[in-house]
Swiss-Prot record:
DNA-dependent RNA polymerase catalyzes the transcription of DNA into RNA using the four ribonucleoside triphosphates as substrates. It comes from the Bacteria. This is DNA-directed RNA polymerase subunit beta. It comes from Francisella tularensis subsp. novicida (strain U112). Transmembrane segments: none annotated. It is an enzyme of class 2 (transferase).
């Protein structure tokens, strides 16, 4: 087994028995693939069936009303973005690119005859059609400077669905849902009548739709019912027994007798195959029935007197005595009737036709028009156009390829081609037929929560739909423009207005429910946000009306949606996460991978199955035992089939799971020993990992699952090598790799990677990248070069490993509280950096422009000490609460001065200050260091000194960066040429003869530019040098061009909002140490609040004097049933012991051979998966050992983790008791505790619920307008609510004075609180109480009821 660069530095020992069959697919592919499909920028691959191309093709050509102009679509191009991703974030711009569409305007001769079209002119040009937001490499969008994610939506798939309303007997319904257009419903009522609805409007008879489609009453009955023939004569009535086989399973309503009056089959019996044979053998072809039965029948076809042409009865008329008499009169002794006798099937349509008052197609169309447009007069043309537009015109109704596929599959017919996306007559007839079958018990209703009936709509598809909406508006505009514009040489640009497209797309990205502000607490929260699948949003469910069924875990979720990770609260079950191996197919259905089983042998061939396909197979679990030939060991195997868990013979198995973790999401797969935790707690654990704050120093988990590196790699926060090569240069800002051209398919000789330094994330955490490679290291493509935030050697590291003791300690861990050691604070283990952005905007006001300046009236020098001459804070300044960050003045209206004030001003020579101080100050409760300042100005007033200074710094930095980049390229080209040419024969060189040998010394005397002028006799060598020469020249041109582009973007004017003159952004880094009140958690849903930070010397300690870091309450485990944390602690302790073992070996010797023995014991004595230490050289073994001193990292994959025996064996090797318990001593007294305590290493996270962000205090502040009570909450700088129950408490103690001030001066007694403030200033310690404002509100409310109520002050005066 080969190891990557980062893995060699620290190999994770892996438990788990199952073989590795399939790599976890790229975690962000659901986002990137979907949007790539939408843009389909690569025309060579054929932009045909999706995205922009199809929308544009469907919308064009557009024809003018008079037919003179036609606008055709030809092609489109997506331009280059103005700014790159980082620049857009800095400037608050959107990362997008212009869409230019090539349109062809065809002009026809207006004098030509109406039926012929003579082309007069064709004009073609590219037309700007708005800006399309581009997706960043990590699957996000930058909209107005902020990173956003478009969450995929799980919605009901287009197609037909049959369901049953349990509240009513026989209330079955069918609903045809298109991708775009009107919904069509058919439903049974309790009487067996079939009703139809369009778009959930008023219901009408289903037969109205059939008549509107052109069917006659007779044709409708023929389609939906069986017919029987009745013969009648003087003896009575007889029913012909045709198609006996069709009657099988039906209940007989009469006895069947033979010629001798023997009963062959009795009445009220279900007919069987044996009965049918008996009847046929007896030669019975008809059976006598009485008139009572005949009178329940109806005529199947119109009965016409052939002699006169008179209609005796219409189809569906009841059979009556008079009708029979009329038939006898004209000599008809046979009557074709609808078969209600042997089946109920025909009665539903027949009864519906009885209710249906329309007689033909025209009346049916009018009836539908009245339902959809009540009040509108129905005109013949508009009536037909409305009905056709509903279901039969592709621009207004589309089932889409998914809907057509689902509809054909559900009706079990392929009569309609896959390419027809509108409804056909046969579809509607088929749906009604199937509905009748279901009512008759011959079909099944659909399970709406089955993932075969729900599909995922990803970002590309949503943007495509928005684009279609915008384009539809543009199309209407084009038609209007064609008829209004009178221009000799009309061009496409003149008639196309692209604003509706821009508006539709902008609206979707800025205010759409599924376009969300990216969760960026840590890399995991980014990844899970992008993999989220929501059932909410437009066209989805609403959380108020979603029931239990839709939220529940369904059998089809297996391997597709995670059954664990979902929010707690009102959205539970509506927002899900994609399972780790799941993918979305071309139709939008979720698929899971399986290994194919052929003739009882499990192959490594992988097949992806959708939920519909999976129902038909028997699938074995990933943990099923196999022999060395991949055959099943056991005869009876636990499998899944049709959504049920079954035991079955191994010969029946068709597929097998790929991995044990395929049913859970990426976040749940990060929890070790997940299988030993209760599902509710795992849900909390998976959700809380997303809230972990990245700390100053990242530390890998000692006990992981092996999923850490996958999440870190795919999150895009680490820097990954594009090509193999050697590290040429490293510093904190840049890594330079000299590319190995033999291994890499690239013409580049150098790869340069720029690192992100101290960037603010969406959640104000700090994004920072650190290189992990050294100069001279050899790296392969795909190796990690630099860690991002919350990663350690390319592994996700959300917290720290702490030594935990499960024991109570003086009540400080009561109710999930956490007792911490001071060592954690000293070592800055949970210290995190938060970057806050403060913005100051100078606007143009009515009274004049606001000004950012250091010259502010009535502000002391000390307050301005941290500002520069422009009035903006210096970078590096330490700022406290209340400090000025940006000094700004706002003009205020002139005020009239009293004579006294004018006199004073004259005496003290003070100028009238007509400006107010509106500076940006540091908010209360915060302090930190200014790390960056950005100034944005419009060009009108010229740039300020600070703006010019920042601009110059950026240009100088860019110049330096590009110069250094070029120097690196030059040195690489130089060394590669030198290696090739030294010792070669010269063709031509200044200072040397032809045929001379080139030496290193001679090259050293020449500048590099002259090297490139030397030519050689060897043609191959000459070609190589020529290639290097060309690469060097191209690189020089490219770097100059890049610098010019960068310079242009730095100096480019900023587009500020209207009325804004200048915007200043100040970034302050705030360091937050862990303190009491902060929330911490493990990975098993074991959360708590820090109650106390205890000095190290008071913490319980082990026999060797090592103090523990954390004391957790043992009572938090049994009831919560998250035993995984105990196993993690045991395995963590073993890992720590193994690290100590390696450290002791290192202290004795640094010989690789000895170290290999220790490593062999540590890695390969326990567990099935061995580590190949032979793949590492001696130097790498030493580095590995140095990195393992703190503990040997262990991976225990979910559902395939370490067993109890493995943990005991490792504890033994690590030198600990196999029960994981030990004697602890009290740090305060030095005495041992009574019982042994479970001690181990657990990975603990600090969550983004910090006490600093919640604690807040107020003396005076703002008040509510109506009640005049202080506002509530930190954001409003509100007060502490003293509620009803608190008042009762004071009443119970009789604390009258305290109560009075709580309800008056401290709350809403306006006069009293003003007086109180004055009294405090004057040194008077008295309190004047007035009527609280809430009483006045009450009085006014009572007055509103017409009762005059006032307060009686007389008793007070007396």
């Amino acid at each position: 087994m080969s190891y990557s660069y980062a893995e060699k530095k620290r190999i994770r020992k892996e438990f788990g028995v199952l073989p590795h069959i399939l790599d976890v697919p790229y975690l962000l592919s659901i986002q990137t693939e979907s949007y790539k499909k939408f843009l389909t920028a690569d025309a060579a691959k054929g932009r045909l069936h999706s995205g922009l191309e199809i929308v544009l093709k469907q919308s064009f050509p557009v024809e003018s009303k008079n037919g003179q102009y036609e606008l055709h679509y030809v092609d489109y191009q997506i331009g280059e973005p103005t700014f790159d991703e980082t620049e857009c974030q800095v400037r608050g711009a959107t990362y997008d690119a212009p869409l230019n569409v090539k349109l062809r305007l065809v002009v026809y001769n207006k004098d030509a005859l109406p039926n012929e079209k003579i082309v007069e002119d064709i004009r073609e040009e590219y037309v700007y059609m708005g800006d399309i937001p581009l997706m960043t490499t990590n699957g996000t969008f930058i909209i107005n400077g902020t990173e956003r994610v478009v969450v995929s939506q799980l919605h009901r798939s287009p197609g037909v669905f049959f369901s049953k309303d349990d509240s009513e007997e026989g209330a079955f319904s069918a609903r045809i849902i298109p991708y775009r257009g009107s919904w069509l419903d058919f439903e049974f009522d309790s009487k067996g009548i079939i009703w139809a609805r369009i778009d959930r409007k008023r219901k009408f008879c289903a037969t109205v739709i059939l008549k509107a489609l052109g069917y006659t009453q007779e044709q409708i009955l023929e389609n939906f019912s069986e017919t029987k023939t009745i013969t009648f004569n003087s003896k009575g009535f007889a029913l012909r027994l045709d198609n006996l086989s069709n009657m099988k399973g039906e209940l007989l309503k009469f006895d069947i007798v033979d010629a001798q009056d023997n009963v062959i089959v009795k009445k009220n019996k279900k007919l069987t195959s044996r009965d049918v044979k008996k009847i046929k053998d007896a030669g019975v072809d008809s059976v006598a029935i009485d008139f009572d039965l005949v009178s329940t029948l109806r005529v199947a076809k119109d009965i016409v007197n052939e002699a006169t042409g008179e209609v005796i009865a219409y189809a569906n008329d009841d059979v009556t005595e008079s009708l029979l008499e009329s038939c006898v009169e004209v000599g008809m002794l046979e009557l074709e009737v609808i078969d209600f006798i042997t089946t109920e099937r025909g009665r539903y349509i027949s009864d519906t036709l009885k209710y249906d008052l329309t007689r033909n197609t025209d009346e049916a169309l009018v009836e539908i028009y009245k339902v959809l447009r009540p009040g509108d007069p129905p005109a013949a043309a508009s009536v037909k156009a409305l009905f056709e537009g509903l279901f039969f015109i592709e621009s207004r109704y589309s089932l889409s390829d998914i809907g057509r596929m689902k509809l054909n599959a559900r009706l079990g017919s392929d009569k309609v081609s896959k390419d027809i996306y509108t409804l056909e007559n046969s579809d509607i007839v088929g749906v009604i037929e199937e509905l009748i079958n279901i009512r008759d018990g011959k079909g099944k209703v659909d399970d709406i929560d089955h993932l075969g009936n729900r599909r995922v709509r990803s970002v590309g598809e949503m943007v495509e739909n928005q684009f279609r909406i915008g384009l539809y508006r543009v199309e209407k505009g084009i038609r209007e423009s064609m008829s209004l514009v009178h221009k000799d040489k009309l061009m496409p640009k003149d008639i196309v207005n692209s604003k509706p497209i821009t508006a539709a797309i902008k609206e979707f990205f800025t205010s759409g429910a599924l376009s969300q502000f990216m969760d960026q607490d840590n890399p995991l929260s980014e990844v899970t946000h992008k993999r989220r699948i929501s059932a909410l949003g437009p066209g989805g469910l609403s959380r108020d009306r979603a029931g239990f069924e839709v939220r529940d875990v369904h059998a089809t979720h297996y391997g597709r949606l995670c059954p664990i990770e979902t929010p707690e609260g009102p959205n539970i079950g509506l927002i899900n996460s994609l399972a780790s191996y799941a993918r979305v197919n071309d139709y939008g259905f979720l698929e899971a991978p399986y290994r194919k089983v052929v003739d009882g042998k499990v192959t490594d061939e992988i097949e992806y199955l959708s939920a519909i396909d999976e129902d038909n197979y028997v699938i074995a679990q990933a943990s099923t035992k196999l022999d060395e030939n991949n055959h099943f060991v056991e005869d009876l195997i636990q499998c899944r089939s049709g959504g049920e868990a079954i035991f079955t013979e191994s010969s029946r198995v068709q597929y097998m799971d790929v991995s044990a973790k395929q049913m859970v999401s990426a976040a749940a797969a990060l929890i070790p020993f997940l299988e030993h935790d209760d599902a509710n707690r795992v849900l909390m654990g998976a959700n809380m990992q997303r809230q972990a704050v990245p700390t100053l120093k990242s530390e890998k988990p000692l006990v992981g699952t092996g999923m850490e590196k996958i999440v870190a790699r795919d999150s895009g926060n680490c820097i990954i090598a594009r090509n193999a090569g050697e590290v040429a240069e490293v510093d904190s800002n840049r890594i330079v790799i000299k590319v190995d051209t033999e291994k890499s398919q690239t013409s580049n000789l150098v790869d340069i990677y720029s690192l992100t330094k101290f960037k603010r994330s969406n959640k104000n955490t700090c994004i920072n990248q650190r290189p992990i490679v050294n100069v001279g290291d050899k790296v392969e493509a795909g190796d990690i070069l630099a860690d991002g935030f919350a990663t350690d050697f390319g592994e996700l590291s959300l917290g720290h490993n702490l030594m935990v003791a499960f024991m109570p300690w003086n009540g400080y861990n009561f109710e999930d509280s956490i007792l911490l050691s001071e060592r954690i604070v000293k070592d800055d283990k949970y210290t995190s950096i938060h970057i806050e952005e403060f913005t100051c905007v100078a606007r143009d006001t009515k009274l004049g422009p606001e000004e950012i300046t250091a010259d502010i009236p009535n502000v002391s020098e000390s307050s301005l000490a941290k500002l520069d001459e422009s009035g903006i804070v210096h970078i590096g300044a330490n700022v406290e609460a209340g400090d000025i960050l940006v000094a700004k003045i706002t003009p205020k209206a002139e005020q009239q001065l009293t004579p006294e004030e004018r006199l004073l001003r004259a005496i003290f020579n003070e100028k009238a200050s007509n400006v107010a101080d509106s500076s940006l100050r540091m908010p209360s409760g915060t302090s930190g260091t200014v790390i960056n300042v950005q100034v944005f100005e419009n060009d009108k007033g010229g740039k300020s000194k600070r703006a010019l200074k920042i601009e110059k710094e950026l240009i100088d930095k860019a110049r330096k960066d590009f110069d250094e980049e070029f120097a690196v390229i030059e040195s690489v080209v130089k060394s590669s040429i030198e290696q090739e040419v030294v010792g070669a024969k010269i063709q031509k060189a200044k200072g040397l003869k032809k045929g001379a040998i080139l030496t290193k010394e001679f090259l050293a005397t020449l500048p590099f530019s002259k090297w490139l002028e030397i030519s050689f006799e060897d043609e191959k060598l000459e070609e190589k040098v020529q290639n290097a020469r060309e690469y060097y020249e191209e690189a020089k041109i490219a770097i100059d061009a890049k610098f010019e582009a960068k310079k242009k973007s730095i100096t480019q004017s900023n587009e500020l909002s209207p009325g804004v003159l200048k915007t200043v952004k100040v970034f302050v880094a705030i360091k937050k140490r862990i303190q009491p009140g902060d929330k911490m958690a493990g990975r098993h849903g074991n959360k708590g609040v820090v109650s106390r930070v205890l000095p190290v010397e008071d913490m319980p300690y082990m026999e060797d004097g090592t103090p523990v870091d954390v004391c957790l309450n043992p009572l938090g485990i049994p009831s919560r049933m998250n035993i995984g944390q105990i196993l993690e602690a045991h395995l963590g302790l073993a890992s720590y012991g193994l690290g100590k073992k390696i450290e002791k070996t290192l202290e004795k010797t640094r010989k690789a051979a000895e170290l290999r023995k220790t490593l062999e014991e540590v890695y390969n004595s326990v567990g099935d998966k061995k580590v190949n230490l032979e793949a590492l050289n001696d130097e790498e073994i030493l580095t590995l050992c140095d990195n393992l001193k703190g503990g040997v990292p262990i991976a225990t994959p979910v559902f395939d983790g370490a067993k109890e025996e493995d943990i005991k064996s490792l504890l033994k090797i690590g030198g600990f008791a196999t029960n994981g318990q030990m004697k602890l001593f009290d740090g305060r007294t030095g005495k041992p505790f009574d019982r042994h305590v479970t001690v181990g290493y657990m990975y603990m996270l600090k969550l983004d619920h910090l006490v600093d962000d919640k604690m807040h205090a107020r003396s005076t502040g703002s008040y509510s307008l109506v009640t005049q009570q202080p506002l509530g909450g930190k954001a409003q700088f509100g007060g502490q609510r003293f509620g009803e129950m608190e008042v009762w408490a004071l009443q119970a103690y009789g604390a009258a004075y305290t109560l009075r001030e709580m309800l008056t001066v401290k709350s809403d007694d306006i006069a009293g609180r003003s007086k109180m403030y004055k009294n405090i200033v004057d040194g008077k310690l008295t309190m004047n109480v007035d009527v609280p404002e809430s009483f006045n509100v009450l009085r006014n409310e009572v007055r509103a009821l017409g009762i005059d109520m006032d307060f009686d002050y007389s008793s007070e005066e007396e």
